[in-house]
Amino acid sequence: MQEQYRPDMIEPKVQQYWAENKVFKAIKDESKEKYYCLSMFPYPSGRLHMGHVRNYTIGDVISRYQRMLGKNVLQPFGWDAFGLPAEGAAIKNKTAPAKWTYENIAYMKKQLQLLGFGFDWDREIATCKPEYYKWEQWFFTELYKKGLVYKKTSTVNWCPNDETVLANEQVHEGCCWRCDTPVEQKEIPQWFIKITDYAEQLLGGLDTLPQWPDMVKTMQRNWIGRSEGVEITFDVANTNEKVAVYTTRPDTFYGVSYLGIAAAHPLASLAAQNNSELAAFIQEAKNAKVAEADLATMEKKGMATGLFAIHPLTGDKLPIWVANFVLMHYGTGAVMAVPAHDQRDFEFAQKYSLPIKQVIAPLADEEIDLTKQAFVEHGKLVNSDEFDGKNFDGAFNGIADKLEKLGVGKRQVNYRLRDWGVSRQRYWGAPIPMLTLENGDVVPAPMEDLPIILPEDVVMDGVKSPINADPNWAKTTFNDAPALKETDTFDTFMESSWYYARYTCPQYQNGMLDAEEANYWLPVDQYIGGIEHATMHLLYFRFFHKLLRDAGFVTSEEPADKLLCQGMVLADAFYYTSPTNERIWVSPTQVTLERDEKGRIIKATDPEGRELVHSGMTKMSKSKNNGIDPQEMVEKYGADTVRLFMMFASPAEMTLEWQESGVEGAKRFLGRVWNLVYQYQQNPAKTSLDLTALSAEQKVLRREVHKTIAKVSDDIGRRQTFNTAIAAVMELMNKLTKASLDSEQDRAVMAEALSAVVRMLYPITPHICFELWQALGNESAIDTAEWVKADEAAMVEDEKLIVVQVNGKVRGKVTVATDADEDTVKTIAFADENVKKFIDNQHIVKVIYVVGKLLNVVVKP
């Protein structure tokens, strides 16, 4: 081996070896335990960012470790290649989305290979390829035949000038991103999959996932939102109409003072027929697209319809209001309002001077002030006829029973979860495989017509989808009669909901999945990705697995046994304010820093000498220009250094602060490992380790080696605390660099230690370890080496080193048996030559013994 550590020379050579020998190719082998490790695949945006690097490094460390344990490891890779950004980039760069996407894939693949990830590239998937989405289209038609797919009208963002649908990201402050025309809300027919049919299974399945983060499971439980309540039907006075509401608080039923309905509710349209003011308000409310998350904080607005509902128990007439906080797609599109016991209803009632009637009192009889806020806790009923004095449970059941007997109510389990709308009025997606016949009937495209191929050689004008703009694309036939293809494309969450399963058989042509391969590899043993996917991708991922199970493709209940959600990568962000008062963000790589003695930034300047404002550590982003290019870092420091820093700087689930000083520290550490192996190699051990001939110092060093092996094995395997595993190896390295190499047994102990260090670091820094493994005299590549095992016997301490002090000053060290009592320790210590000269001819006043550690002798003349 050469004397200097040169990652620029080592890494390309090792990567070439891996590629040529297909080291990471996974083949089904029933004789071996499988291990499927998967990191969420990326959108091919053009360049890797540090978030990608962190995600894939974690997955690669786990994969390499599991391979060393003797498991048959699958670690595939692919591209979530459809999506809106490609359309924007195509318009900007005057190219086709497909061309832009494929160029990005090629570039990012090279970047990934520079980092040395052990992917099985023979299983690579790009979701924009027809051979992938063909089976997605086929599966959709099968779900349609099973009654799990339907079409209904739904609200979209509509630009009246361009006559096109806009994604939420294309609406800027209520206007079209392209022409600045005010955006309207429009109802159009869209396709839905009945995820609500699986709500109970999705909820119950969370209890079978002990190795998923609790936060993710809680977020999914809340998103599914199971509630038990009562659906109540009110008659509308002086009409034949009825209005239904759903409530989880029937105990408050006697306190209802008005009903709120959504702007899109049929009753609202009825009331607006002869009321132009109400019609205008309804239109305004419809156009003001409201996210559920904003309901609590938005200004509550409403208008009376002039209609009244009849309270089924009291006979009271309750005014019906159109309210902007009631959403048509949530529940029944109508709510019973109890201002005394719901804060939102309270704010609305106060604004419009509606009655506030108390029907719940605190259990402890304390005073409440219903002029300031609603009392929302459970309590005992008041002003509620025969139910006065009952608690929540008693009132819930009593009032529900009464409503059911009267035929105006029924107990019901509801879910917050809505069916999955999969239609997108975009071009760059998989075409939805449905056909419209001349008579208006809609039928699924037959298998022989699949895939319905998305044309890739198109021109984007930024207005209409090319398949919508082309009058001929949609034309087709069905049973020899003219038909039209659907011009909507799938939500890209469709592709990412089943890719993990297709990786098990990416070249399989006879069906969606090869059940034999799928059931060998699935479920995924370790899935890795950001927690931001908790309620979208990770829910659809679980849903699709249950659909695949019910279609007979898989036998497992859940798609992944274990989930790790890695933290974000942060970097310093700097800016200056321009003459037009705009913040100009400067890349941290262009900033010169001054720090105080504690390392805090006290001054930052850009290359022009401008003083910059340091806005702190924030998530790497284009908007703040604080992204660090992984490729630049690999070229500067080497892939192993970048990987080591990524795994060491923070626990995997926590945010990671990018500090170049930390990267430099990682490079220095690898240099020390290299130097120690080089130093050992100059005079290596010529005989094997003789455990019977070890000195006390050699036993202590060997004990440290095996204690480190035990800790690192537990940290990487069970605990997945990779940073503490690395810290343990660093601590061991400090001891090894101070160890003697003088005797043959010294060198034999060192040989064992270095073999262990190289194997422990291999999952994290594989290139340098590949080279060092060979330098240590191993003939086969480290990629086939077994994980190092701790020797239990070596960790047993049969002797202790006791520090001996005389009058508080260290005068010697003695070795005693671990179970030696105080008298034995004193006898050995007093006989030690170094100690004797300080206690001979002295009067021993007292002896203090700290068991197993220290003996202090207090003397005087």
UniProtKB/Swiss-Prot annotation:
Recorded GO terms, molecular function?
A: aminoacyl-tRNA deacylase activity; ATP binding; leucine-tRNA ligase activity
Q: Which InterPro entries match?
A: aa-tRNA-synth_I_CS, aa-tRNA-synth_Ia, Leu-tRNA-ligase, Leu_tRNA-synth_edit, M/V/L/I-tRNA-synth_anticd-bd, Methionyl/Leucyl_tRNA_Synth, Rossmann-like_a/b/a_fold, tRNAsynth_Ia_anticodon-bd
**For the motif 'HIGH' region, what are the positions?**
42-52
Q: What class of enzyme is it?
A: ligase
Q: Where is the signal peptide?
A: none
* Intracellular or extracellular location(s): Cytoplasm
Q: What's one GO-annotated cellular component?
A: cytosol
Keyword Ligase present in the record's keywords: the answer is yes
Supply the alphabetized keyword list.
Aminoacyl-tRNA synthetase, ATP-binding, Cytoplasm, Ligase, Nucleotide-binding, Protein biosynthesis
Positions binding ATP in this chain are 622
**Motif 'KMSKS' region located where?**
619-623
Coiled-coil annotated spans: none
Gene3D superfamilies hit by this protein: 2.20.28.290, 3.10.20.590, HUPs, Isoleucyl-tRNA Synthetase, Domain 1
Among Pfam families, the record links this protein to: Anticodon_1, tRNA-synt_1, tRNA-synt_1_2, tRNA-synt_1g
Per the UniProt record, which EC number(s) apply here? 6.1.1.4
List the SUPFAM superfamilies hit by this protein, alphabetically: Anticodon-binding domain of a subclass of class I aminoacyl-tRNA synthetases, Nucleotidylyl transferase, ValRS/IleRS/LeuRS editing domain
Can you state which reaction this protein catalyses?
Answer: tRNA(Leu) + L-leucine + ATP = L-leucyl-tRNA(Leu) + AMP + diphosphate
Q: Does the keyword Nucleotide-binding apply?
A: yes
Its GO biological process annotations read: leucyl-tRNA aminoacylation
Q: What family is this protein classified in?
A: Belongs to the class-I aminoacyl-tRNA synthetase family.
HAMAP family recorded = Leu_tRNA_synth_B (MF_00049_B)
By what name is this protein known?
Leucine--tRNA ligase
Which species? Haemophilus influenzae (strain ATCC 51907 / DSM 11121 / KW20 / Rd)
Instruction: State the organism's lineage.
Output: Bacteria, Pseudomonadati, Pseudomonadota, Gammaproteobacteria, Pasteurellales
Name of the gene: leuS
